[in-house]
Design a protein with these regions (language model features):
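Extended alpha-helical scaffold regions
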Residues: 1-471
Length: 471
């Protein structure tokens, strides 16, 4: 990253025998820095902060020395700051705040110049000449639409730095549409590494768009934008990719849902805080008159973690369906089978089949991924007193923990649910029975005889299915 402002600090001594020598050294150093920035070709600003020692006094010629240094180096007065001595803590904080405010204005102007330069280059409508000679075998030149995506992306990032989120969103949207157009992503073969690189860039731009909309508190628009990207990529992968009936696609779906959950966790959305007990946010005024679907509203993070868990279930199911021949490492498979396997699976941001679900070694821990998403979702629902969904997620967590034989955590989740279960009073006997059997297995393996007897007594009810003891 090239800095917008290069801030340097220098101290001046009050010793008259060393003042001239030190001032000359400071001027020489500042001049060298200034010349170096000019030769680099970048528009980085240079700002100087001079600190005077504690025994100095403004009446002792300190201001004259500072003016002499500034004029000798040709520094703009707006970029040259003096911190007087013997100031209180409050005064120093005020000086620091004023300095940062002035430097911030220079940084904004720096990024405004860069954005103007990027828009000017895009408006030329020609492919720029390469700055370095192409290397045989490794050169990947861009087409004109590719350069347009590059310039739009740069303009959007510079607008983000200036906190102009509306302008940034428009530039990101333009870059997104050009990238997913018929002249770029759709003509890249899905076996090429550039295909996954282009998909990654599309995801990055979509995430940036979400960030801009959430920054501007356009929450419904952000959810719609999330769904729009999901639908566009689904259509693209179905038409020119490897389809959506594979573990790789559901790995992406799970990750895309988690992106929105992470956004909600990190952003200070006060209207959706657990203390408000709100499940979702009402639409903003600009779209309040439209007929919105429930899934177009911004729900709390638990909703998105639960969605991520559902796709992780599908990922595991597709992974377990991988044929044994494809689960072998490439070194143990014929070359022809390795070549055919390379074009059969979507491995965008996920492991190869022999790493996803290997024959002999431990592959991806799907249970851990699912359990992590379920527990996060359960925590969010519990904060908002959505007890029925908390019970459902607790049972889902218990199923995963049962497969790993973590009986202590199964007990921790199911004992409160079994003692205060609304499904029992409402006649949901199949759910009640499922909870009972799973809790009985955990109690038996935890040596809780009292709990085993109590559960057995309930399972002997005539309304339950035929009792088959499962130890």
């Amino acid at each position: 990253m090239i800095p917008s402002v290069f801030l340097c600090f220098y101290s001046l001594t009050s010793d008259p025998t060393l003042a001239t020598l030190q001032d000359n050294k400071v001027k020489s150093d500042i001049s060298n820095l200034k010349n170096g920035l000019l030769k680099s070709g970048y528009r980085t600003r240079l700002a100087i902060v001079v600190l005077s020692d504690k025994v100095a006094s403004p009446t002792e010629g300190m201001q004259e020395r500072v003016d002499n240094i500034r004029k000798g180096c040709g520094i703009d007065p707006k970029a040259f700051f003096l911190v007087p001595p013997q100031n209180s803590q409050e005064e120093l904080e005020r000086i620091a705040e004023n300095t940062l405010t002035t430097i911030y204005a220079q940084a904004i102007e720096y990024y405004r110049d860069l954005g103007r330069h990027a828009r000017k280059k895009r408006s030329r409508g020609v492919v720029p000449q390469p700055t370095i000679p192409p290397t045989f075998g490794t050169s990947q030149t861009l087409s004109l639409p590719g350069w347009h995506v590059r310039y739009d992306f740069k303009s959007a990032v510079f607008a983000e730095y200036r906190s102009e989120m509306d302008a940034a969103f428009r530039s990101f949207e333009q870059a997104y549409e050009n990238l997913l157009g018929s002249e770029l992503l759709e003509i890249i073969p899905n076996w090429s590494p550039r295909w996954n690189e282009a998909r990654l860039l599309a995801d990055i731009i979509a995430i940036r768009c979400l960030r801009c909309l959430l920054w501007n508190k356009q929450y419904t628009a952000a959810v719609r934008r999330w769904q729009y990207h999901r639908e566009r990529i689904t259509d693209l992968v179905d038409r020119v990719g490897r389809g959506t009936k594979n573990y790789g696609w559901h790995a992406w779906e799970a990750r895309w849902a988690k992106v929105m959950a992470d956004f909600i966790d990190r952003l200070p959305i006060q209207d959706l805080a657990p203390s408000t007990m709100k499940i979702y946010l009402l639409p903003e005024k600009s779209v309040a008159a439209e007929r919105l679907q429930p899934w177009e509203l911004l729900h709390h993070a638990g909703y998105w973690y639960r969605m991520s868990a559902k796709h992780l279930y599908s990922r595991r199911a597709f992974a377990y369906a991988i044929p044994e021949d494809d689960r072998r490492p490439p070194s143990f498979s014929p070359a022809a089978r390795v070549a055919s396997k390379a074009f059969s699976y979507d491995t965008y941001m996920c492991p190869e089949p022999h790493d996803e679900y290997p024959l002999t070694q431990v592959g991806v821990d799907h249970s851990r991924l699912i359990l992590d998403a379920l527990l996060r979702a359960r925590s969010e629902y519990q904060k908002r007193n959505q007890l029925r969904l908390v019970a459902e997620l607790s049972l889902d967590c218990a199923r995963e923990l049962t497969s790993t034989k973590d009986w202590a955590k199964v007990m921790e989740l199911l004992v409160p649910l079994w003692e205060h279960m609304s499904f029992r009073d409402e006649g949901w006997l199949s759910i009640t029975e499922d909870v009972g059997w799973r809790l009985r297995s955990a109690a038996f393996n935890s040596a809780r005889a009292d709990l085993v007897v109590a559960i057995d007594w309930e399972l002997l009810n005539n309304c339950k299915s035929k009792l088959v003891w499962r130890i």
